[in-house]
Every structure is written in C-alpha cells, then in structure tokens.
Amino acid sequence: MAAVQIDDYGPWTTEPAPRRETDLQALQARLFADVADFLGGRDGYAFAGRFDNMVGAATGIAPAAFERLQERIRNRYPVTVSVGIGTARTPADALDAAGTALRDAGSAQDENRQEALSHRSPPGFAGTPGAVTIAHFDVVDATGTYTDTVSPVRAGTEIQGAVTTLAEYLYDTHDAVTQFVGGDNAIAVCPEIDAGIVDDATAHVREAAGVDFQVGVGHGDTPHDAGADAKHALETCRATGARVHGPWTTADD
C-alpha cells in the first residue's frame, strides 16, 4: 500500500494570503488524476482519500518507481508530494507502515520535508507482497432509493455514512482498507475473504446505517486484476439479484 501526501500543503494554502477555495479544489482534483493515471498505468489502484492525503494499492510496483510520480508532480504543480510505501501481511498493516514511513520523514507541515520516499514493513515481517483481494460494494437501487427520491444532501449523507460504517467495520475486524470511490460505490482492499465475511459486513451496515450493499469480490496478482474480477462479479449480482458474488462461487450457483 502507498500513502501519498502533499508536502507542507496547509501553510501553502494560506501563504502569502489565503488562496481561493475553488482553485485549491481544482488543483487537488488534477493532482489526484495524475496519481490515478500513474498507479493505474502500473496495474495499481488509487483512492482520493482526503485529497491532500491519497492512498494507493501498489502491489507489484517497485518503490523506486514512485520517483517518476514525484517528478511528474514537481513539473506540473506548485507543490510536491512525499510517498510512504508499506508491505505487510494485511492491507491495513501495510498502509499503517506506509504512514509510519511518512511520519518518520517529517511532519506533513515540515517545510524541510520535500519529496521523501520511503518503504517500511512492520517489525518481524519478512514476506513479500502476495495476491490481492478487492471487494467492490455498490448500494442496491441507489437511484430509486436515493438519487431520484430524496435531496442531494440526504442522498450524499446516507450513502457516505454507510461507506464510513463499512470502512470502520472492515478495518477493525478484518484489516481491510475501504475507500469511497464516488456515486454509490466503495472499494475495499482486503486480506483473502470469504462469502461469510462479506455477508457479515453488509449485515452490519444494513443494521447500523439502513443501507443495503451488493458486492463483487475479485482475486488477482495485481490490484487491477483483482478489481476487474470484482467488477465482473458485481455485474453478476446486478444481473441475478445476488447480494454477493466472488471467486468462491461456482459456475452453477
């Protein structure tokens, strides 16, 4: 997993005077697009996160390759980025290690930290990145239940609240990293999971937030491979009415 952080961004947004919010939003959107292109071009996944702090699923991408991303950002924007990369047994542990790598390089608002690039693993971990599992969550009938029925504010708070509930549950119980990816969709980078784990997660969200998810799960050597399988599995859910479909499902199910 990778953590991509804009260097000294908070002070930059206010010096020498506070910058226009729309300009900052446009900068963040363009910068994230470059991060997504970089990771996607190498079969990874990118998530906007908080925009000044982005997340990547980077299995199969050499840490040194991120120097190219840093060069691209430096040449195109008035800011730079630092990158922490973590390798661990689970996505949550890997992202925690990536965050540690960034913090060890200096504060997010340290004017002397620029384009840091560091790779970490948890103490005692000596393995290599394994296969990737992606779960793609989609709200059942979001258009009929929310988009065409309630105000945009209500639709947004209901869906994003459900994603937050899902993300906290999967992080706390299964060491997965879940991100909202727009519309009514969320993607979770998971340890290897089974249908029972997914059913428990969706049941928890249904009870806690009142939102019903359908889920496609994929498995592959890279985030792209696993994500593509997950999207195809999700289409099977939409076509059949199943709530969960994944690599454990037989062709006759």
Curated annotation (Swiss-Prot):
Keyword 4Fe-4S: no
InterPro entries per record: GTP_CycHdrlase_3, Nucleotide_cyclase, Rev_trsase/Diguanyl_cyclase
GO MF: GTP binding; GTP cyclohydrolase IIa activity
Catalysed reactions, as listed in the record: GTP + 3 H2O = 2-amino-5-formylamino-6-(5-phospho-D-ribosylamino)pyrimidin-4(3H)-one + 2 phosphate + 2 H(+)
Pfam families listed in its UniProt record: GCH_III
HAMAP family, per database record: GTP_cyclohydro_3
Protein name per UniProt: GTP cyclohydrolase III 2
Gene: gch32
